[in-house]
Amino acid sequence: MKNAFFVTASIACGKSTFIEIANSLGFKSISADKIAHKILDENALELEKIFSPFSLKNLLKKEKKIDRKILGEIVFNNKEAKKILENFTHPKIRAKILEQMQILDKENKAFFVEIPLFFESGAYENLGKVIVIYTPKELSLKRIMQRDKLSLEAAKARLDSQIDIEEKLKKADFIIKNTNSYADFRQECVKVIQEISKGNM
């Protein structure tokens, strides 16, 4: 799809912030995370039955939604559970993303698709160009620990579960560095978005 631009990175690199900036400039977007969260909630009771053997903690919140923090702890520490979750959710997420992409592509204007596991999934390659947001590993770890209230060990486990950021950079069509202030990052984002917009006219 000529109007599709995928946004990916490692954890806590600024993908969602890029999307917010793009939205503020009048560009539409799709978020794999938001779609995934909705799918988890819609299938909460079934997922609770599947994953309750993996944990002594209650996977359901009071409002009958999945406790994503507990589910995250399970899948990041158990390869079997991770595979089960991926097999359950990924086809549903991909179908929804492709459905929304087809709608936006008809508008003949650049749009952005935020997919954290773009390279890991291998399900979206050749569907559009790729923007990789770069943050050094040390900074990513610090942000993960602060944002998600995780220990260094837990943060490393989450980061190590993904393809190394340096490998992702090699496959990028566009690279945006997020290593300094928000103002610097926004400037880098706007620059790339403008470049894409001009090339897509």
UniProtKB/Swiss-Prot annotation:
<keyword id="KW-0547">Nucleotide-binding</keyword>
<dbReference type="GO" id="GO:0004140">
    <property type="term" value="F:dephospho-CoA kinase activity"/>
</dbReference>
<keyword id="KW-0418">Kinase</keyword>
<comment type="function">
    <text>Catalyzes the phosphorylation of the 3'-hydroxyl group of dephosphocoenzyme A to form coenzyme A.</text>
</comment>
<feature type="binding site">
    <location>
        <begin position="12"/>
        <end position="17"/>
    </location>
    <ligand>
        <name>ATP</name>
    </ligand>
</feature>
<comment type="similarity">
    <text>Belongs to the CoaE family.</text>
</comment>
<dbReference type="GO" id="GO:0005737">
    <property type="term" value="C:cytoplasm"/>
</dbReference>
<comment type="pathway">
    <text>Cofactor biosynthesis; coenzyme A biosynthesis; CoA from (R)-pantothenate: step 5/5.</text>
</comment>
<keyword id="KW-0173">Coenzyme A biosynthesis</keyword>
<dbReference type="InterPro" id="IPR001977">
    <property type="entry name" value="Depp_CoAkinase"/>
</dbReference>
<protein>
    <recommendedName>
        <fullName>Dephospho-CoA kinase</fullName>
        <ecNumber>2.7.1.24</ecNumber>
    </recommendedName>
</protein>
<keyword id="KW-0963">Cytoplasm</keyword>
<dbReference type="GO" id="GO:0005524">
    <property type="term" value="F:ATP binding"/>
</dbReference>
<keyword id="KW-0067">ATP-binding</keyword>
<dbReference type="InterPro" id="IPR027417">
    <property type="entry name" value="P-loop_NTPase"/>
</dbReference>
<feature type="domain" description="DPCK">
    <location>
        <begin position="4"/>
        <end position="201"/>
    </location>
</feature>
<keyword id="KW-0808">Transferase</keyword>
<dbReference type="Pfam" id="PF01121">
    <property type="entry name" value="CoaE"/>
</dbReference>
<dbReference type="GO" id="GO:0015937">
    <property type="term" value="P:coenzyme A biosynthetic process"/>
</dbReference>
